[in-house]
């Protein structure tokens, strides 16, 4: 006969709880919704085991799995075996099974679609995978760019190593990236050619998507004759702007070790320098995702230099995400918060800011007017008017 389990603690007995005056606690415990508690535990499991998703995404980018599916044609789905056959020198007999498990994970995050079909004589099912709507951003487009490079940057060893110093930075101060590499991320670029290449490629990929949308929606480039792009990297942002506004003379301004790799672009002059020292003169100054890399003090120094470089009625066009003052659970809110914490680990005082904080910076730098103009794919285009 099976032994009836008993509690080793008499106070756990319901009747004992009542006798001890704990009836309310007992009732509260047993009133808890079991389904709700299960959902909370399942979510906790997802959090505890979330590392495989970014790692699998990185491997998918390296193997170009999404590109292989895209090459098959619109709305096509491929089995893991078909995808494995398209890999270069795929001599591993277990590759299809491994890819199937990886793609299954990506399907749970809606990166790919999945249809299970009858496996026929082999028994079981065969899963076929296609591209979900978000996947197009991780497949090279007509400009040869994707957000895959941004994944490679964030998953690269230079950035990954920074996270190991986050606890130390919280307790002792300092910037995790600096603790690992002995310098800030921007000077580190000049010492590591491979990292510099990945960084520039990631910035190029993201900028290309965003600036094309901005040029279509934002009309503030009209009547500008000389536009200075501060922190313009290799000049691709100005390439898009000047191709749409040929009358604009573009000045691509960045650190010398960045500018030396910049290609020749019609209508664009590359100028090396330091934005904390001085900025070339222009009718308007453009800055996309620059201020979020720096502390308020550094931003003020840069903005004051912008103010000096502008004529009366000139403007700084700032493109940045805007942090929401109270956390939300939307994909955009999560993306902004994730980037904010990345900046905390990698940049000298960098952070995402609220609209109110941008207005405070603009006013402190001497600008007469702060004007949020339009919202484009998660970014705000804001004008600081002199």
Swiss-Prot record:
O-methyltransferase participating in the biosynthesis of natural products derived from phenylethylamine, including mescaline, a natural hallucinogen potentially used in psychotherapeutic treatments. Catalyzes the O-methylation of dopamine, 4-hydroxy-3,5-dimethoxyphenethylamine, 4,5-dihydroxy-3-methoxyphenethylamine and N-methyl-4,5-dihydroxy-3-methoxyphenethylamine. Also involved in the conversion of N-methyl-4-hydroxy-3,5-dimethoxyphenethylamine to N-methylmescaline. This is O-methyltransferase 12. Optimum pH is 7.5-8. PROSITE patterns: SAM_OMT_II. It is an enzyme of class 2 (transferase). The active site is at residue 292. The keyword Thylakoid does not apply. It comes from Lophophora williamsii (Peyote). GO terms for biological process: methylation. Optimum temperature is 45 degrees Celsius. The keyword Methyltransferase applies.
């Amino acid at each position: 006969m099976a032994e009836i389990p008993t509690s080793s603690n008499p106070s756990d007995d319901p009747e004992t709880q009542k006798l001890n005056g704990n009836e309310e606690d007992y009732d509260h415990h047993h009133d808890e919704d079991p389904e709700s508690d299960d959902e909370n535990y399942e979510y906790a499991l997802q959090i505890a085991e979330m590392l495989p998703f970014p790692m699998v995404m990185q491997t998918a980018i390296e193997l170009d799995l999404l590109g292989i599916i895209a090459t098959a044609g619109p709305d096509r789905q491929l089995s893991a075996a078909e995808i494995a056959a398209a890999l270069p020198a795929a001599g591993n007999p277990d590759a299809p099974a491994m890819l199937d498990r990886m793609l299954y994970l990506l399907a749970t995050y809606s990166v790919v679609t999945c249809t299970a079909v009858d496996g026929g004589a082999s028994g079981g099912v065969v899963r076929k995978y296609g591209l979900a709507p978000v996947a197009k951003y991780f497949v090279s487009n007509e400009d040869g760019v994707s957000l895959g490079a941004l994944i490679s940057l964030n998953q690269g060893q230079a950035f990954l190593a920074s996270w190991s110093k986050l606890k130390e930075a919280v307790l002792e101060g300092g910037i995790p990236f600096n603790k690992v590499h002995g310098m800030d991320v921007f000077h580190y670029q000049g010492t590591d050619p491979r990292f510099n290449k990945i960084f520039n490629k990631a910035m190029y990929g993201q900028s290309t998507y965003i600036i094309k949308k901005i040029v279509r929606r934002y009309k503030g480039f009209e009547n500008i004759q000389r536009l200075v792009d501060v922190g313009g990297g290799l000049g691709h942002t100005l390439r898009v702007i000047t191709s749409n506004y040929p009358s604009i003379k573009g000045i691509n301004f960045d650190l010398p070790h960045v500018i030396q790799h910049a290609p020749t672009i019609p209508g664009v002059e590359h100028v090396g320098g330091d934005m904390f020292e001085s900025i070339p003169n222009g009718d308007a100054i453009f800055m996309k995702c620059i201020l979020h890399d720096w502390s308020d003090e550094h931003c003020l120094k840069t903005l004051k230099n912008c103010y000096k470089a502008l004529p009366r009625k000139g403007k700084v066009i700032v493109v940045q995400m805007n942090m929401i003052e109270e956390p939300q659970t939307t994909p955009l809110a999560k993306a902004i918060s994730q980037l904010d914490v990345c900046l905390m680990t990698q940049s000298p005082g960098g952070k995402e800011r609220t609209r109110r904080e941008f207005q405070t910076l603009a006013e402190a730098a001497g600008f007469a007017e702060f004007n949020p103009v339009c919202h484009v794919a998660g970014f705000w285009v804001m004008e600081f008017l002199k």
